[in-house]
């Protein structure tokens, strides 16, 4: 009982008295569950073998305008804010001018990858892009991410 009380007091001090954290952070008394995490560490796990990933259906008879509308929607609704902002601004700027072949490449890029973090890391050049996705569209996306025009991208562009 005394041990539990002591542990509870130590944890509550760490949570509710942050000024004590810095004083003892230099010592070796930092509990492992409160150890600082470095900002430059990328947590990236391989997809497990037992997790079956669904195949993305190919739509060969889809009209080009319908495909572009679908891709515009999918670029805006990725499930993670970072890609929502990057891909929605990219699609608003370039998708309307893509040819049928470029549109198919963009479709494969955003729907063929099983993990959105991969797209983000490739576009920001944190991780090298695999050869199958290193296309003209990916190069255009990387240039868009560099934001040479210094455009503010705090929100998705309006739909027109």
Swiss-Prot record:
Q: What is the extent of the transit peptide? A: 1-30
Q: Does the keyword Mitochondrion apply?
A: yes
- Entry superkingdom: Eukaryota
PANTHER family this protein is in? PROTEIN EMI5 HOMOLOG, MITOCHONDRIAL, SUCCINATE DEHYDROGENASE ASSEMBLY FACTOR 2, MITOCHONDRIAL
Q: How does it assemble?
A: Interacts with the flavoprotein subunit within the SDH catalytic dimer.
Q: Which Pfam families match?
A: Sdh5 (PF03937)
Q: What does this protein do?
A: Plays an essential role in the assembly of succinate dehydrogenase (SDH), an enzyme complex (also referred to as respiratory complex II) that is a component of both the tricarboxylic acid (TCA) cycle and the mitochondrial electron transport chain, and which couples the oxidation of succinate to fumarate with the reduction of ubiquinone (coenzyme Q) to ubiquinol. Required for flavinylation (covalent attachment of FAD) of the flavoprotein subunit of the SDH catalytic dimer.
Mind listing the GO biological process terms from this record? Answer: copper ion homeostasis; mitochondrial electron transport, succinate to ubiquinone; mitochondrial respiratory chain complex II assembly; protein-FAD linkage; tricarboxylic acid cycle
| Gene Ontology annotations for the cellular component aspect, listed alphabetically | mitochondrial matrix; mitochondrion
Name of the protein described by the UniProt record: Succinate dehydrogenase assembly factor 2-A, mitochondrial
Record's keyword terms, sorted = Chaperone, Mitochondrion, Transit peptide
Would you identify the family this protein belongs to, as annotated? Answer: Belongs to the SDHAF2 family.
Localization (cell)? Mitochondrion matrix
Answer yes or no on keyword Transport. no
Which HAMAP family does this one have?
SDHAF2
In terms of InterPro entries, this protein maps to: SDH, SDH_sf, SDHAF2
């Amino acid at each position: 009982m005394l041990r539990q009380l002591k542990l509870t007091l130590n944890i509550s001090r760490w949570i509710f008295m942050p000024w004590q954290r810095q004083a003892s952070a230099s010592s070796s008394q930092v509990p492992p569950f409160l150890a600082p995490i470095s900002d430059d560490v990328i947590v990236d796990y391989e997809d497990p073998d037992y997790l079956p990933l669904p195949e993305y259906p190919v739509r060969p008879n889809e009209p080009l305008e319908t495909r572009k509308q679908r891709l515009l929607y999918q670029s805006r609704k990725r499930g993670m804010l970072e890609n929502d902002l990057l891909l929605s601004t990219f699609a608003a700027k370039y998708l309307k001018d893509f040819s049928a072949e470029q549109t198919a490449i963009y479709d494969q890029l955003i729907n063929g990858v099983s993990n959105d973090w991969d797209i983000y890391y490739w576009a920001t050049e944190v991780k090298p892009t695999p050869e199958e996705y290193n296309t003209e569209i990916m190069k255009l996306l990387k240039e868009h991410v560099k934001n040479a025009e210094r455009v503010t991208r705090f929100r998705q562009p309006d739909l027109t």
